[in-house]
Amino acid sequence: MWGVGALALVLITGLSVFYRAQVGKKVVTASTSVNGQELPICSVQTGKKQIAYTFELSGTQTGKGQVEQMLQILQQQEIPATFFATPSWIENHRSLAIQICQQGHEIQGLGEQVVCVEQMTAKACRKELRKIRETIGTVTEEPGVFFRIPGGEYNNEVLRTIYACGSYPVAWSVDSMDWKEYEAGELVRQLLQSCTIRDGEILRFHGEGEDSGEMVKLLHPRLKEEGYEAVTVSQMVYKDCYRMTTDGRQIPEKSK
């Protein structure tokens, strides 16, 4: 049904949930929870100075100009990025979605709307994942296997459903707070002051935010000076043989 032949077996222990799924012809195994609490992927222990820029594109937003400006900045800065887009955004901006992929970025799935985490069900999640995969398939041959729920709130049922369907829930470890009504320079200052960037950080931006592009233009050169390289979520996240920490950090069980 999912195009990846997903099958999951969850084994619950006192400390973690071990997940086995068949994706295509490969069986993957991972521990996706801590103390019975399922966790989305927020960052990755890469062993390399890598970071992933992610941008959210919602169907309720109309800032085409901001997205085009962002693409120019990403090209100038030589940053490959991951765009989490809703099905409605892709349908309403199909040519722009194709342009995103043609410029070396990737499109992954974003839930259509923010809902109370208690209202999320496995059935609704499966339906949304199916719609997202079908829609992403209209603009790129690359499968959409990463999924983000708006607002970043998950529950165990939804997370287990995402994993069981052969997908990976991805949140973030660094929030740009680009929705705040501050100048880009001040937002960058606050970001660097509030957190210490480490390898495998997943940075969250709004692709249609008025200050998002300027923030990236100011932030990335500073991180580049410190030796950080930008990669896509697909290039950074482990698909197999990993465990999670309490803050949603992927730890490899063996070499990638």
Where are the predicted features?
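Hydrophobic single-pass membrane-insertion segments
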Residues: 16-26
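Hydrophobic membrane-insertion alpha-helices, especially the h-region
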Residues: 2-18
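Alpha-helical scaffold elements lining the catalytic groove of polysaccharide deacetylases
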Residues: 61-66, 115-140, 153-199, 211-218
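Short low-complexity, flexible loop/linker segments enriched in glycine and/or proline
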Residues: 97-100, 123-125, 184-188, 245-249
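Active-site beta->alpha N-cap acidic-glycine motif
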Residues: 26-120, 124-138, 142-144
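A cross-domain feature marking catalytic cores of carbohydrate-active enzymes
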Residues: 55-57, 83-87, 109-111, 149-151, ...
